[in-house]
Amino acid sequence: MAVTIFAAIDVGSHETSMRIYEISKKYGVHEIEYVHHTARLGLETYSTKHISYTTIDKLCNILNGFSEKMKEYDIHDYMIIATSALREADNNLIVLDQVKQRTGFLIKILSNSEQRYLCYKSLALKENSFHSLIKDGTLLVDVGGGSIQLSLYDKKTLIATQNIKSTKTFSFISIGRIVEDNPKMNKRIIYTV
């Protein structure tokens, strides 16, 4: 029976994480290890639009540690993605170059649409209840380091989606206003505190 070991690395706003999976036709996808370290790229990107050399150094050290862990499992198949913290940094090309030079890794920066697609796809694959959940009116709220994504489903169909950039003045009152301004959302949401 062929078994593939795959590593998925996420360079996020707050932390950089690696999940190692065992994949086989017989047993499907099974997570065998999860490793994460705080890097806080978003702290700099969202306040200065720039990632410092100190943070780049920390990121490279984390990724080199992940590389050692991948050697333990003899992993050759992997993907490294980054989201808004790297996407919105004005020096993201320098960061990508430094990572490539110092770790050998190529990072793919996902667009917001790609990020949300993968998030919802993973929910659909992982949770048996996902399809029954979106059968009725459902609001999915994806809170990230750089933004909040609201996605409204009804009868298993995506009706509306809205991305809200996080700012220092952002509050959940903003979500309420967006919901109230969208008749389809307003009919289907129960407000709770």
Task: Cite the ranges covered by each PLM segment.
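Short beta-strand-loop/turn "lid" adjacent to the catalytic site in phosphate-handling enzymes
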Residues: K69-D97
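Short glycine-rich, Thr/Ser-proximal phosphate-binding strand/loop in the N-terminal lobe
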Residues: H14-Y53, K155-I189
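Short acidic, glycine/serine/threonine-rich loops at helix termini
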Residues: N92-I94, Y120-S122, S151-D154
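Short, well-ordered amphipathic alpha-helical segments that serve as non-catalytic structural scaffolds
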Residues: D57-K69, T192-V193
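Gly/Thr-rich phosphate-binding beta-strand-loop-beta motif of the actin/hexokinase/Hsp70
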Residues: A2-V29, S132-T161
